[in-house]
Each structure stands twice: as structure tokens, then as C-alpha cells.
Amino acid sequence: MAKITGNLVATGLKFGIVTARFNDFINDKLLSGAIDTLVRHGAYENDIDTAWVPGAFEIPLVAKKMANSGKYDAVICLGTVIRGSTTHYDYVCNEAAKGIGAVALETGVPVIFGVLTTENIEQAIERAGTKAGNKGSECALGAIEIVNVLKAI
């Protein structure tokens, strides 16, 4: 029985990153964590393109455009949605998650879900480089690994 695994070497790989501007004080940290991790694992900065969109709801469309371009081995999607007092949070979270997942399945390109969906600002800050780590960095590791798993199949 063969065991297929992916290594964490990003040398020679190209990445697209889509980041939401809404809650940019959090998303800037997620983006920095993702880029730092990709570079530490061998990616060159000129092999990483970033696109900014208004909010998490708009991420899937740009992710699909990047995935369909043929330029990228993986696309990383970063954003932050913080629950408010209305149901808007639920709609944005659900549609962003569905859309990002659909892009990966439709294109065959790894598309990583790095949209924080938190109950409050404190949880978002914790996941952007403080006590709960940096989810942007974790998404970058996931992107590298899944690209290499697919190459090994």
C-alpha cells in the first residue's frame, strides 16, 4: 500500500493570495504570516501575487480568476468576519466558505480557506499572530502541502 504525502518545500511553486480589505488590521497580519511562511519554505517573493478585495464575500470570484489563470499552483484566501448583531455574519461566512470550496473543486487548483469567522475581535486578534498562532501562516503550510500531495499522485 502506497502512502502519499506532501512535503513542505515551496521552491519553484507560485502562489496567489486573495485578501479582504474589510478588517484589514487583522488581515494584514494574516497576509504577512502567509508570505513569511511561503518564503521560509523556499518560495520566492516574486512567485507570490496578492490581490485585495473589498470583503470576504468577494474573495471567491477573484480566487476563481486566479485559479483559472494557470499561473498559480495554489490560491490562499484570507479574510476576517466578526459576528455583529445581525444575521449578515451568517450569510457572508456561508457564502465565502461555499464559494472558496467550489473554486477548488471546479478548477482542480488548491484553494485554501483562511477566512477567520469569529465571535468577537479578541478571537480574531488571537488568530492573527498572538496566542492562537497565525492562521495565515497555517494556510500557507496547507497550500504547500496540498500542492505537493497532488504532484505526488
Curated annotation (Swiss-Prot):
Keywords associated with the record: Riboflavin biosynthesis, Transferase
Assigned protein family: Belongs to the DMRL synthase family.
Active site: 88
Subunit structure: Forms an icosahedral capsid composed of 60 subunits, arranged as a dodecamer of pentamers.
Catalytic activity: (2S)-2-hydroxy-3-oxobutyl phosphate + 5-amino-6-(D-ribitylamino)uracil = 6,7-dimethyl-8-(1-D-ribityl)lumazine + phosphate + 2 H2O + H(+)
Family annotation (Gene3D superfamilies): Lumazine/riboflavin synthase
Keyword Transferase in annotation: yes
Enzyme superclass (EC): transferase
Binding site for (2S)-2-hydroxy-3-oxobutyl phosphate: 85-86, 127
Keyword Transferase: yes
PANTHER family associated with the record: 6,7-DIMETHYL-8-RIBITYLLUMAZINE SYNTHASE, 6,7-DIMETHYL-8-RIBITYLLUMAZINE SYNTHASE DMRL SYNTHASE LUMAZINE SYNTHASE
Molecular functions per Gene Ontology: 6,7-dimethyl-8-ribityllumazine synthase activity
Official protein name in the record: 6,7-dimethyl-8-ribityllumazine synthase
Upper classification of the organism: Bacteria, Pseudomonadati, Pseudomonadota, Gammaproteobacteria, Pasteurellales
UniProt xrefs under SUPFAM superfamilies: Lumazine synthase
One cellular-component annotation, GO: riboflavin synthase complex
Pathway stated in the Swiss-Prot or TrEMBL entry: Cofactor biosynthesis; riboflavin biosynthesis; riboflavin from 2-hydroxy-3-oxobutyl phosphate and 5-amino-6-(D-ribitylamino)uracil: step 1/2
UniProt cross-references to InterPro entries, sorted A to Z: LS, LS/RS, LS/RS_sf
Role noted for this protein: Catalyzes the formation of 6,7-dimethyl-8-ribityllumazine by condensation of 5-amino-6-(D-ribitylamino)uracil with 3,4-dihydroxy-2-butanone 4-phosphate. This is the penultimate step in the biosynthesis of riboflavin.
Binding residue positions for 5-amino-6-(D-ribitylamino)uracil: 22, 56-58, 80-82, 113
Entry's Gene Ontology BP terms: riboflavin biosynthetic process
EC assignment: 2.5.1.78
